Amino acid sequence: MKNAIVDIKDVNKIYGTNHVVKDLNLQVEEGEFLTLLGSSGCGKTTTLRMIAGFEEPTTGSIRVEGEPIEDKEPYERNVNTVFQSYALFPHMTIFDNVAYGLKMKKISKNERKERVLEMLEMVQLAGFEKRYPSQLSGGQKQRVAIARALINRPKVLLLDEPLGALDLKLRKQMQLELKRLQKKLNITFIYVTHDQEEALTMSDRIAIMHDGVMDQIGSPTEIYERPATKFVATFIGETNVFDGTIRSIENGRAVVSIENGEITSSGSVEEGVEKNTGFAVNEFVTVSVRPEKMHFSPEPVDGFNVPAMVKDYIYVGSVIKCIAVLPNGNEIKMEKLAGEELPAIGEKIFICWAPEDAVLIHSLDNRFYQSMENIKLA
């Protein structure tokens, strides 16, 4: 990456027999909002702590602005960290909390005042400088913590699940505020969360970590629409997966054997195989289709068609979640807008989707995806 401000190369972190981060290579662009996303224990927070200087890599290197930082103390690195716990000084006013870093750097009193007031206005807390942390709401405390971190003008701001303690409505509001602030200041944000919606809402790119490995990195659209692994497909939102084996590839068509049926795919599969970048006969694969991409039909139509029976509907506000049962007993999840005409529970229907909405994933190496076309139940 041409303008990488953070460059992580071949980094491993091992605690005893626990290999927490495995051969991580990651470049973060200047001014980018990058999110490290994954479930608990995947290595995302450890990665953040290594950048901050609270942990050291077992092997590998980390550079910020092209300079190695492994031998630098946390306070010597041009990065600041915001934690979920806020870590505000309860005996200090909001002004003094935000000004603390400037005071330690012996910045003049007049400049401190000017920069603190400017930063409080930026995080929409103008007029709060004389209050104490105990007089603020959770969202206000988090904005103070962010202001305190940003006032030192770091090149990189590290955020470790900073919104995790907030209620849902406030969390959504803070997501938009953080994104606005990041774009206004043009500071690189590296954000850690296990919340998929949070990552999709704020990020320029998302790095998905799983069991210490970075499974995929890409834009929110790429991650959601074209997952590279089965883990990514099932971790980001909901999806329907069909596991099977490619039985044959002939004349541009790949036939995938699944339980109680076959899925036939045509299109660019053959070209991929010829180039040794696609799929092969006897390969174990996964087909992934998002619930919102599926549709009801009273009759089979061109494309992929699945006979099923409507089992249940779940109302969740503007969306209705639909559950249908396949002949083999497996369930398929669909999403429809509230108010749409829907078949009755117990009614037998066909489920279909557009060819470009299905994704074929290599299941063994979990490192490649391919769109499927003209998919249907054989």
Feature map (PLM): residue ranges:
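Conserved coupling/switch loops of ABC nucleotide-binding domains, chiefly the family-specific signature
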Residues: T58-S61, E111, D211, D243
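ABC ATPase nucleotide-binding domain
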Residues: D7, Q27, R63, F350-C352
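Helix-to-loop junction immediately C-terminal to a conserved catalytic motif
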Residues: A52
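Conserved ABC transporter NBD signature motif
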Residues: G60-P68
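Non-catalytic connector elements of ABC transporters
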Residues: T239, I249-A378
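The feature captures the beta-strand-to-loop junction immediately N-terminal to the Walker
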Residues: L37-S39
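ABC ATPase nucleotide-binding domains
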Residues: F33, K72-T234
